[in-house]
Amino acid sequence: MKKFTKDEAIKIVVQCAQAYQKELDGKSLLFLCTDKHKRVFPFEFSFYGNNYLHLTGLKAPKGADGESAGLFANDFYQKCLDHKLSPADFEFSEDGTTHMKLEVLPTVIFKNLQAKMIGDYNSSKPRLYTEKVAGSTNACVGFILDQTMQKYVPN
């Protein structure tokens, strides 16, 4: 797994934010799937600007009190779109997931996203909370039901 520098991370997330805005932001994708009994069932996933920060794996920087500082998901996304993101605006996740997410981010932010597998997540990994998973053996995206909107969104 490649370890990215902050400058490399900025280049990736700024470039991908432009594609995310064009391809997914404010849109829903409908996947039609078949189960082993050949029954067809739909999965609809919706994408919004406030989901982008989580997709990158980057975290808001911590303040002097050890709590996350005031960079919110929408602010982060707008800074990416405006090409104004700086190294001080984010941190890498301590568990290493940021680097994994940055490596696959350019491949999962397109409306022509193909998923070889879609299904319920079985909670087999203790630090991953999600309800639905869509992807392949190379990358996947987790989704949860947003209780306010009653839509599945990336988490």
What are these regions (language model features)?
Residues 1-128:
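An acidic, glycine-rich, mixed-charge low-complexity segment common to nucleic-acid enzymes
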Residues 133-155:
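Compact beta-sheet-dominated globular domain cores
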